[in-house]
């Protein structure tokens, strides 16, 4: 039955009989043809999607990158997470279907005045570039592997410093990503506020104070407990998911640049080594506005 001779004979018999049947049953034949075409198109589309993981030629993806499973780059989100401890929590909190995690070790270098030809000397910057599929200084975003890039750092002053350095990196060396609206800053809470069984979160001190007053006004009998997170690593996976990573519940601030705005001038004043005097004067003038 499985011999070559029998296969040739049976194939010819089936082909002739099936061709005759198709000629006599045109509607059914049309349906079968449409199914075959749809399946072929699905296979072709699937083959194209697989290329998402192979967009980058050359270096392999960073070993610390925990990638998502979606084959659609537009749906993917890359979280650049401060610290390996927080990176572990983020991996457990993420939706593996479309959220990828790249933990960053320590404080990223100040790249504001670093030439584009030298910026990849930083291992962390190199990992970011490879994970993104975009080279620093390039206007070509065809290889971009994610629709959103989310900076996720601690909510305290140290975390804000790291987030500022990452924003500077994108403004200086990945500006087309910013102009395309691809870069976001995640806003994790600094406080957890419990009143009975109710749980609330606050981004900063002003929001915490306002929320505590509102809760006291509504219910004076139930004790209010306030917990300050020391860092992202102190949050468990469920807390990180519901406050920072879950679409619809999280807060993201889009990093934007517009013609005529002063974003670059402000970052230059904050990070340029040559402008220490300008920084000193700015701190003397604006330092009272800081919440410390």
Locate the predicted segments by residue.
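Active-site-proximal structural scaffolding
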Residues: 7, 11, 58, 77, ...
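Conserved phosphate/anionic-ligand binding catalytic regions in large, soluble enzymes, centered on
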Residues: 69-94, 156-165, 230-245
């Amino acid at each position: 039955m499985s011999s070559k001779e029998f296969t040739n004979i049976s194939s010819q018999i089936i082909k002739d009989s099936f061709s005759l049947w198709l000629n006599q049953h045109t509607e059914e034949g049309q349906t079968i043809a449409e199914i075959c075409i749809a399946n072929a198109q699905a296979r072709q589309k699937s083959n194209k999607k697989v290329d998402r993981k192979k967009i980058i030629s050359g270096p392999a993806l960073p070993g610390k990158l925990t990638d998502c499973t979606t084959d659609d780059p537009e749906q993917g989100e890359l979280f650049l997470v401060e610290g390996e401890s927080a990176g572990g929590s983020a991996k457990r909190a993420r939706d593996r279907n479309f959220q990828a995690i790249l933990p960053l070790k320590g404080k990223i270098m100040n790249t504001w005045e670093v030439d584009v030809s030298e910026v990849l000397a930083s291992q962390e910057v190199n990992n970011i570039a490879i994970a993104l599929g975009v080279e620093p200084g390039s206007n070509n975003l065809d290889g971009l592997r994610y629709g959103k890039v989310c900076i996720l750092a601690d909510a305290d002053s140290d975390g804000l410093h790291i987030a500022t350095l990452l924003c500077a990196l994108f403004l200086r060396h990945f500006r087309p990503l910013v102009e395309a609206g691809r870069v976001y800053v995640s806003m994790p809470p600094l406080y957890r506020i419990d009143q009975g069984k109710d749980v609330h979160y606050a981004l900063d001190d002003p929001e915490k104070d306002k929320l505590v007053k509102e809760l006291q006004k509504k219910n004076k009998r139930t004790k209010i407990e306030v917990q300050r997170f020391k860092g992202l690593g102190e949050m468990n996976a469920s807390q990180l998911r519901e406050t920072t990573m879950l679409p619809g519940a999280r807060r993201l601030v889009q990093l934007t640049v517009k013609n005529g705005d002063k974003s670059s001038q402000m970052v230059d004043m904050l990070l340029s080594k040559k402008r220490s005097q300008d920084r000193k004067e700015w701190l003397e003038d604006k330092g009272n506005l800081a919440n410390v």
